[in-house]
Amino acid sequence: MSAQDKIIKASHLITMDDIIREGNPTLRKEASEVSLPLSDEDIILGEKMMQFLKHSQDPVMAEKLGLRGGVGLAAPQLDISKRIIAVLVPNMEDSEGNPPKEAYSLQEIMYNPKIVAHSVQEAALADGEGCLSVDRLVEGYVVRHSRVTVDYYDKKGDKHRIKLKGYNAIVVQHEIDHINGIMFYDRINSQNPFAIKEGMLIIE
């Protein structure tokens, strides 16, 4: 049974056991585009990936299933070499503890996502990046574009173009790297991990 056949079973919930770790060759492959119109199997896979992210951000479900919190997941992390990503970025409470008007600033399953334009300005998260496929702490600035324009298809096969900046842009770039066989630490300066290039935006 393939990894995808197992994951798309109605009764299956994605857990950390389904996520492959660094060193697995699938994480270093350029993933294949999915064909359109999408197969039921690829639609279900995307929905399962989004379900995993929601579970990982729910304290009760995360504890029950033993999940690490995540804001993005790419199909290659499930040992499925396809160009499918899911991103789920929650909005935070305001300074007075009030819940946000919208629960998420970005919630999307993207098929064949592609960066079609990007800013000259670079950016990195102040606290660095982590990855569900990496079980160790890797410190340093992960240098990315501060703004990106991304084309992708949704599960209906409709094409979309979105412009992203800041944290959302970083998350989507991290996941698109996965479908291109790139790990986040490839983008850290190995000689000086906390080097700041001129004009680089540090996102707190």
Swiss-Prot record:
InterPro entries, per database record: Peptide_deformylase, Peptide_deformylase_sf
Pfam families cross-referenced by the UniProt entry: Pep_deformylase
Cofactor: record remark: Binds 1 Fe(2+) ion.
Principal EC category: hydrolase
Annotated active site: E175
Any one GO MF annotation of this record: metal ion binding
Keywords of the record: Hydrolase, Iron, Metal-binding, Protein biosynthesis
Superkingdom of the source species: Bacteria
Residues that coordinate or bind Fe cation: C131, H174, H178
Protein name: Peptide deformylase
Lineage: Bacteria, Bacillati, Bacillota, Bacilli, Lactobacillales
Gene name per UniProt: def
